[in-house]
């Protein structure tokens, strides 16, 4: 992903 958080970083 892009920008979402630390835990959801990469899952968009």
Curated annotation (Swiss-Prot):
InterPro entries: Periviscerokinin. Signal peptide: none annotated. It is found in: Secreted. The modification Threonine amide is found at residue 12. The keyword Cell cycle does not apply. Mediates visceral muscle contractile activity (myotropic activity). This is Periviscerokinin-1. It comes from Derocalymma versicolor. The lineage of its organism: Eukaryota, Metazoa, Ecdysozoa, Arthropoda, Hexapoda.
């Amino acid at each position: 992903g892009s920008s979402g958080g630390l835990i959801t970083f990469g899952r968009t």
